[in-house]
């Protein structure tokens, strides 16, 4: 929802960046913005009780076999006995949240959130680079992290946003706190996969 921004500060619930609507990837943040606008309109027009939840990058043992995000590929590779192969330096900063923490955050907002408000779901102890996430899965799974050159097609599919970290103060003020940092979330993910 937030789009691209300047600077290194994490996104708060009231900060928005630029979305290039001619970029094919723009459909994702644009559709999320449209959904939130509909929620706000229904609250104002019909008095519908609405809370908005904005999760960061949620990971855990719930990914599908076709999910090609790094947070799904890395644990699948480790579980299959493979080393983790990275096709970039992995310097992009992301707010990761273990799936169980995300579930408790959603319940907290549904029960305690203020109607009409939006809440980021972010674990301040798991704001890490993609490389650091890969290192956590490699460490827990006893595998190596290997870097290879990306093909032109692979490079074209990368999300180049350097910093998509989120603040968590607003949801923490409701009494929520994350229980799993990146290392414990990686361990729990690998231990729960079949």
Model regions: which residues?
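Catalytic helix-loop patch of NAD(P)-dependent Rossmann-fold dehydrogenases
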Residues: 1-53, 57, 66
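Amphipathic terminal alpha-helices
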Residues: 182-194
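C-terminal "lid/loop" region of Rossmann-like NAD(P)-dependent oxidoreductases
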Residues: 89, 116-119, 131-134, 142-163
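Glycine/proline-rich active-site loop of Rossmann-fold NAD(P)-dependent oxidoreductases
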Residues: 33, 59-73, 82, 87, ...
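Hydrophobic alpha-helix immediately C-terminal to the catalytic Tyr-X-X-X-Lys motif of short-chain
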Residues: 34, 38, 42, 74, ...
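Residue-level signal for the nucleotide or nucleotide-sugar donor/cofactor binding architecture
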Residues: 26, 30, 66-69, 94-100, ...
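Glycine-rich Rossmann NAD(P)(H)-binding loop
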Residues: 58-62, 86-96, 119-128, 154-160, ...
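A short C-terminal helix-loop "cap" of Rossmann-like NAD(P)-dependent dehydrogenase/epimerase domains
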Residues: 12-19, 74-86, 140-152
């Amino acid at each position: 929802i937030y789009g691209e921004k300047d600077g290194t500060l994490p996104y708060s619930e009231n900060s928005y960046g630029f979305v290039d609507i001619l970029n094919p990837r723009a459909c994702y943040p644009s559709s999320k913005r449209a959904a939130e606008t509909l929620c706000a309109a229904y609250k104002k027009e019909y008095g519908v009780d609405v809370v908005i939840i904005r999760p960061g990058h949620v990971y855990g043992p719930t990914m599908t076999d076709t999910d090609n995000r790094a947070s799904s590929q890395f644990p699948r590779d480790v579980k299959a006995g493979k080393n983790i192969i990275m096709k970039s330096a992995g310097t992009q900063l992301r707010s990761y949240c273990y799936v169980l923490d995300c579930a408790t955050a959603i319940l907290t907002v549904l029960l305690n959130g203020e109607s009409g408000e939006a809440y980021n779901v972010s674990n301040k102890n798991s704001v890490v680079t993609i490389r650091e996430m890969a290192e956590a899965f490699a460490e827990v799974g006893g595998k190596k992290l290997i870097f290879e050159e990306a093909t032109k097609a692979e490079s074209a599919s990368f999300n180049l946003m350097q910093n998509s970290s989120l603040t968590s103060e607003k949801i923490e003020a409701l009494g929520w706190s994350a229980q799993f940092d990146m290392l414990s979330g990686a361990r729990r993910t690998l231990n729960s996969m079949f």
